[in-house]
Amino acid sequence: MAAGSITTLPALPEDGGSSAFPPGHFKDPKRLYCKNGGFFLRIHPDGRVDGVREKSDPHIKLQLQAEERGVVSIKGVCANRYLAMKEDGRLLASKCVTDECFFFERLESNNYNTYRSRKYSSWYVALKRTGQYKLGPKTGPGQKAILFLPMSAKS
């Protein structure tokens, strides 16, 4: 490949590619840093979800997995559990993937990401300034609590 050249890969069927990226682990593990209070989203092995400021906590290492375009599941690598939003807006970690474990991932204009529940479509993953999760019905666009910056969690 010559310096300055660009290589393109087929992405659409008419270009010789598939219609969508295959589901799977296509990203390196991440830490999700919340703008509100400076906490990292943490998934505990017992199913609890909260935020912690300690960068070395092993339970903040998360695997984001694409399920379809714009939709991800978030798995705690150490906890081996999936982030889920329940019907009352609580965040918890499930041992298996359910329809409550899928979130619309969106890059906002301020370069932070938001994670909105696919099942409860007006509710977001959010952390309060105390590090506790915020109930889904109390979240909405424009809140700092819903803004997350994905950071590398490579060892």
Curated annotation (Swiss-Prot):
User: Which InterPro entries does the record associate with it?
Assistant: Fibroblast_GF_fam, IL1/FGF
Modification Phosphotyrosine, positions: Y82
Q: Where is this motif: Cell attachment site?
A: 46-48, 88-90
Q: Where in the cell is it found?
A: Secreted; Nucleus
* One GO cellular component term noted in the UniProt record for this chain: nucleus
Which residues are marked as site: Important for interaction with integrin?
K128, R129, K134
Q: What is the name attached to this protein's record?
A: Fibroblast growth factor 2
Which species does this protein come from? Ovis aries
